[in-house]
Structures are given as structure tokens and as C-alpha cells.
């Protein structure tokens, strides 16, 4: 599941260093209602945890981004290089899971009136970690390709080899066309990020 749809329930059966486990008080004495159904408890039980299971594909992570943009706007072509003095200071961007083999890479540009225009690039990978790039945003077209390379960036930040994604793509925003070459150096997988959710009980 890509969202908070499935959980692993864990119930506490014993304790050490505490007086007791807070098992709650049902509205009806002697009743044993479902723990997650708050309507049947006068004091909610605190003796369980719901661990959510959520799928993240291999490319889901935060990356350090650098590259070159060739921008065509109103017939004028300019080139913009994005590259900090050190990799650690490059732009931080995120790639998230869309499906088993597809990841979402959000990019943006500025329109002629100064507003920000966003586009979700869809990176669809094959078994060789090569990807095709398309647009997931209505009204904006994109084409391109790329590749994920394990330890592709040698002696990168922290003096260690780092995984990387190399992308080359063209995006047509309508008012502006951008041809981009990107290098995305893995920063963190983000698997230790705390996410909380509020479960809702639904009777069958």
C-alpha cells in the first residue's frame, strides 16, 4: 500500500518497571469491545500499538541535485548551471513512490508574471534501473530518460561512494521550454522519518 491503509497490531501482555498496563475501562462491565472502537470505552485502552505498513520503492529518497538547464523563452535561449561548491550544499529535492516501478520527481519554474508553476515528472524504471520520463501534470509535456546507478558518485559527500540518478529530459511548460541534465546524489532514504496517523474504526 502507498498510503496508511494496512497496519500490524501489537498488544502488550506484560510490563517491567511499571505498575500495570493501561488496558482501559469498557462502558459495559465485563464486556470486551474492540480496542480501536472508542464508542465502547469509558477509558480508552493504551495497551496496543498499530504499526502502519507503507510501500516505498527503491528510488524513494531525498537527493542532492545539480545540473544544467537550457531555457528557451520568447525566442531567447539562456543556460543556467546549478552546482554548489560542494555536493553537500547542492539543492535538496525529494523523489516519492507512485507505484511499484514509478517514482515522482517534482520540479518547478517561474512564469512571466512571477508565479511558480509546478510539474510532477514521472520516472518509470525497468529491471535494469533505466527510466523513461513523462509528465504527470496536465497541460505540461515532458520526455526524457535516465538511470539509477548504485554507488555511481565516487568519493562523494562524506568521502563515500553514493547512489545516484542521472537524468536528461525536456519539459514544455507552454510559455517556456527547458532542456535539463540532472545529477541526483542520494542524501537519505528517509525510512526513519516519523509519520503518525489517526485510525478510524469501521464495523463490518
Show the residue positions of the predicted features.
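Intrinsically disordered, low-complexity regulatory regions in eukaryotic proteins
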Residues: 3-204
Amino acid at each position: 500500500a502507498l498510503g496508511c491503509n494496512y497496519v500490524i497490531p501489537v498488544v502488550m501482555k506484560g510490563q517491567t518497571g511499571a505498575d500495570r498496563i493501561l488496558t482501559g475501562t469498557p462502558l459495559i462491565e465485563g464486556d470486551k469491545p474492540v480496542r480501536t472502537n472508542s464508542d465502547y470505552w469509558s477509558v480508552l485502552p493504551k495497551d496496543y500499538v498499530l504499526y502502519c505498513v507503507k510501500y516505498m520503492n527503491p528510488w524513494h529518497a531525498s537527493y542532492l541535485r545539480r545540473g544544467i538547464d537550457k531555457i528557451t523563452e520568447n525566442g531567447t535561449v539562456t543556460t543556467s548551471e546549478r552546482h554548489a561548491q560542494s555536493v553537500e550544499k547542492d539543492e535538496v529535492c525529494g523523489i516519492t513512490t507512485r507505484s511499484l516501478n514509478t517514482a515522482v520527481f517534482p520540479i518547478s519554474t517561474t512564469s512571466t508574471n512571477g508565479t511558480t508553476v509546478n510539474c510532477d515528472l514521472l520516472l518509470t524504471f525497468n529491471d535494469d534501473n533505466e527510466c523513461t520520463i513523462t509528465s504527470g501534470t496536465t497541460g505540461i509535456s515532458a520526455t526524457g530518460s535516465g538511470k539509477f546507478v548504485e554507488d555511481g558518485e565516487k568519493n562523494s559527500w562524506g568521502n563515500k561512494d553514493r547512489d545516484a540518478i542521472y537524468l536528461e529530459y525536456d519539459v514544455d511548460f507552454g510559455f517556456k521550454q527547458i532542456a535539463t541534465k540532472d545529477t541526483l546524489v542520494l542524501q537519505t532514504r528517509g525510512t526513519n522519518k516519523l509519520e503518525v496517523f489517526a485510525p478510524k474504526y469501521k464495523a463490518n
